[in-house]
UniProtKB/Swiss-Prot annotation:
Keyword Signal annotated: yes
Native organism taxonomy: Eukaryota, Viridiplantae, Streptophyta, Embryophyta, Tracheophyta
Native source species: Arabidopsis thaliana
Gene assigned in the entry: PROSCOOP8
Single GO cellular component term: apoplast
Entry's induction text: Accumulates upon infection by generalist herbivores such as Spodoptera littoralis. Induced by wounding.
Major place of residence: membrane
Span of the annotated motif SCOOP motif: 54-68
Tissue-specific expression: Mostly expressed in roots, and, barely, in seedlings shoots.
Protein name per Swiss-Prot or TrEMBL: Serine rich endogenous peptide 8
Length: 72
């Protein structure tokens, strides 16, 4: 009798998990409207992107980080 109730309990737990997991994963995925601000922020980041020809190689102002001109 205990084996039958244990298997029924296992079946009930499995069915609950089977029904609850897909609903929680769908709600955690971003919808199409929620992904639009991400696109806007990536455009802002790309607007500050510098190509290799625009990178400043002169070093820091304080001189502590290295680079720049070295005084003998």
């Amino acid at each position: 009798m205990e084996e039958k109730s244990a298997s029924q309990l296992g079946l009930v737990v499995f069915l609950l998990l089977f029904l609850l997991v897909p609903t929680h994963t769908e709600s955690s995925l971003p919808s199409q409207q929620e992904s639009l601000p991400v696109i806007g922020s990536s455009r802002r980041l790309m607007s500050t992107y510098k190509t290799n020809s625009n990178i400043d190689f002169e070093g820091s102002i304080s001189g502590q980080a290295g680079g720049g001109q070295q005084n003998p």
